[in-house]
């Protein structure tokens, strides 16, 4: 049994004594970027921390999980034209997160979940998890709180599709996690231009499945997209509970995954000692 759930609280003797091959490491990755006029730039960090705080209390003592320090700054160049946004280049953050994965692998841990709270990090994580598989035959998982879903019928289909930034979902979560930072007097329905694009064009979309490179101002000049005025703390609390429970299910999946499923190809087999 591990003495803690947090990587940073372990001593080197704790790591030496632990069977790290049985541990699942979790790397929370976030962003510091503008979130419209009604929310702080730390939204993605606060949401990741809030979900994790909700989940940690539900992790059984005998579940070998270690949560690494939150990586607060990510790839946010799509928001760089708004004051307060901090961003790494895609090259810098890819290298940094890959090297964190290298360090995790060097402890003997070969299961790592990237727990993301910012859409702009997606291409980075896709590249990093593949690289860690190549380097370490590691189960490197690309996960996100958003991908774990929300309670049924809580948000409209339009909001789920287009309320992607500082809309109903994120504002509700912030009302649950950090209400002291939310300015509901400045919240509104920040209508995304993606809705008009979807109606006007046959295949072209702003994001997916066939999208283009966009800046936040392309969606809405105020830097938000979605109906923030409809947000409530009750919805945020329900989302937090849903996400925490789903995260535990994900941990169980990753713990149960047999690394023997990750097969070496013929060149790797040829390099292996006989």
Residue positions per predicted region:
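Conserved SAM-binding loop
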Residues: 114
